[in-house]
Regions:
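Helix-coil modules at protein/domain termini and other flexible surface or pore-lining loops
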Residues: 2-139
């Protein structure tokens, strides 16, 4: 699924492991990035600094390295982020800066309580950023 606007989506997922890779940077102009996720393993990967959105998507899927990887976020001239709650839900966010992308991903999830049984506190906790990636021309 590709998101080209400032939208975020909540995804059900397993534990997330992230990988980021930069692609061939453009001297000027529009740069694209993508984040891919595997539903079976929770692996996430990114690819940034591509002149073509399709190339960014293909690179993110390739770097993810799992058969069921799919692009969950496409961004242009900015940043993307993946957050995971203690309940294992995952959300993505996009923004012109890393901070804005991370905030959006966290805000989509909000605080979450750990699944039962949990040996620690059952109090809701904020989501953790597991991957962020920015194009070279991000703000």
């Amino acid at each position: 699924m590709s998101l080209v606007s400032k939208a975020a989506v909540v995804l059900a997922g397993a534990a997330v492991a992230g990988f980021g890779v930069a692609g061939p940077a453009s001297a000027a102009g529009t740069l694209h990035g993508a984040i891919a996720l595997s539903d079976s393993t929770g692996t996430v990967a990114s690819a940034v600094n591509y002149d073509d959105p399709g190339a960014a998507d293909a690179a993110a899927n390739s770097h993810c390295g799992v058969r069921d990887c799919r692009v969950v976020l496409h961004f242009t001239d900015g940043c993307g982020a993946v957050a995971q709650g203690v309940d294992r839900k995952v959300a993505v966010g996009w923004g012109p800066t890393q901070a804005e992308a991370e905030k959006q991903a966290r805000d989509v999830l909000g605080p979450s309580a750990p699944p039962f049984p949990d040996l620690g506190s059952a109090s809701p906790r904020p989501a953790t950023i597991v991957l962020h990636a920015c194009t070279a021309n991000a703000a």
